[in-house]
Amino acid sequence: MSKNIKILVIGAGVAGPAVCYWLRRFGFSPVLIEKYASIRKGGQALDVRGIATHIAREMGIYDQICEMRTRIERGRFVDSSGKVLHEEQGEKFGFRQDDEVEILRGDLVEILMKTIADVPCYFNQSIISIEQNADNVTVIFMDGRIEQYDLVIAADGIHSAIRRMIFEKNEYQLIHLGAYLSTFTIPNYLGLSHIDLECEANNKLVSINSDNNPEIARAGFMFRSQHLLNDIRDEQEQKQFLRDTFRDFGWETQNILNRMPESNDFYFDAITQVKMNSWTKGRIALVGDAGYCPSPLSGQGNNLAFVGAYILAGELKVANGNYTRAFTRYNALLRSFVDANQKFGVWVSESFLVKDEVSKEIAEERSNKILAMIKSISNGITLPQYESS
């Protein structure tokens, strides 16, 4: 197989543009598609930490990430009446240390997309069929076009359509960790400035913060529940579930929920892990949350995406496009790092959403444990060195 192979990358989140960057840098010809009409703005706050900060520097984007980072200066735990129980400096409140940075998902994707300006990118594009044989992969697009590629890399997230198309149901597991997460923006009606407020009790958590844009506040909800929605993707069912769950929670909860209809960036999902014995099948590979989501609560999905993208592209380079050899190495090199991060994801899920209100002692003990564990886990892989073409 010639090195300059044609590779279709699906998904313009974090992992998709990241793997396109490294593929292009290593001499391949990637093409990126995204089902949405444009880059989604805002979104959850993501951390760039550990080994991912090294990769970001290698990509030349670390300084840009720092410039666009969130700037929460203080975090406060409050009770149901709004009384402050405990206050922490913003970086510790977000479990960050050293050169680690928090940035909104949309801002990070925008930075990544600028690094691949020379890569063909097609929005509002999705796939209805994929078939592979010994020579190539035939892809049928929603608009009826039929194209052939040497390889396909799916970076289309935790609910990956490509994973469902290619892998049998017994080849992957979506493990619900017994909790849900929702975020959305609303007007900054409390007049918050670079501060994050959280109320956590009865296995539920409500937060609201505002930093770079003083007009906007970002609300967050987390809660434990074994209830499974009839349709996890139905936004109206999600919102009603949220209202029912937090009906009597107190604090600012009802004021936030009353403003929820004003939001245009509502996000809701089960806190879930994706587990697989192999992230590749034939000529198709999964990268990021599509293959190994550690859970949104872990704060590590972004870092796994950076590391996975780098190793997948690098191994294809070393193998000179021999995908069988490269995919075998990709699975082997990443396995222990993924396993450690997924174990951490379970531990974090069990450590949050406590029964009682968060006292100073509980908050500090939890912060110190997480800071110690995450430093080790986020640096728990030695990256191979791949020479650029």
From Swiss-Prot:
Cysteines joined through disulfide linkages: none
EC number of the protein: 1.14.13.-
Keyword Oxidoreductase appears in the UniProt entry: yes
Cofactor note: Binds 1 FAD per subunit.
Disruption phenotype: Increase in bacterial tetracycline sensitivity.
Broad EC category: oxidoreductase
Binding, FAD: A12, G13, V14, A15, E34, K35, Q44, R105, Y267, D289
Alphabetized GO MF terms: FAD binding; oxidoreductase activity
Pfam families (UniProt xref): FAD_binding_3 (PF01494)
Catalytic activity: a tetracycline + NADPH + O2 + H(+) = a (1S,10aS)-3-(CONH2)-1-(Me2N)-3,3a,4,6-(HO)4-2,5-dioxo-1H,10aH,11H,11aH-cyclopenta[b]anthracene + CO + NADP(+) + H2O; 7-chlorotetracycline + NADPH + O2 + H(+) = (1S,10S,10aS)-3-(CONH2)-9-Cl-1-(Me2N)-3,3a,4,10-(HO)4-10-Me-2,5-dioxo-1H,10aH,11H,11aH-cyclopenta[b]anthracen-6-olate + CO + NADP(+) + H2O
BP GO annotations: response to antibiotic
Keywords: Antibiotic resistance, FAD, Flavoprotein, NADP, Nucleotide-binding, Oxidoreductase
Cofactor: FAD
InterPro entries attached to this UniProt entry: FAD-bd, FAD/NAD-bd_sf, FAD_aromatic-hydroxylase
Activity regulation note: Inhibited by anhydrotetracycline.
Additional comment: Tetracycline antibiotics bind to the ribosomal acceptor site (A-site), preventing binding of the aminoacyl-tRNA to the A-site. The hydrophilic side of tetracycline makes many hydrogen-bonding interactions with oxygen atoms of the ribosome's phosphate backbone.
Function comment: An FAD-requiring monooxygenase active on tetracycline antibiotic and some of its derivatives, which leads to their inactivation. Expression in E.coli confers high resistance to tetracycline and oxytetracycline, does not confer resistance to minocycline or tigecycline. The reaction requires NADPH. Expression in L.pneumophila confers resistance to tetracycline. Degrades and confers resistance to tetracycline and chlortetracycline.
Similarity comment: Belongs to the aromatic-ring hydroxylase family.
Recorded domain comment: Consists of an N-terminal FAD-binding domain with a Rossman fold, a substrate-binding domain and a C-terminal helix that bridges the 2 domains close to the antibiotic-binding site. This last helix is flexible, is not found in TetX of Bacteroides species, and may contribute to their different substrate specificities.
Protein name: Flavin-dependent monooxygenase
Lineage of the species this protein comes from: Bacteria, Pseudomonadati, Pseudomonadota, Gammaproteobacteria, Legionellales
Gene: tet(56)
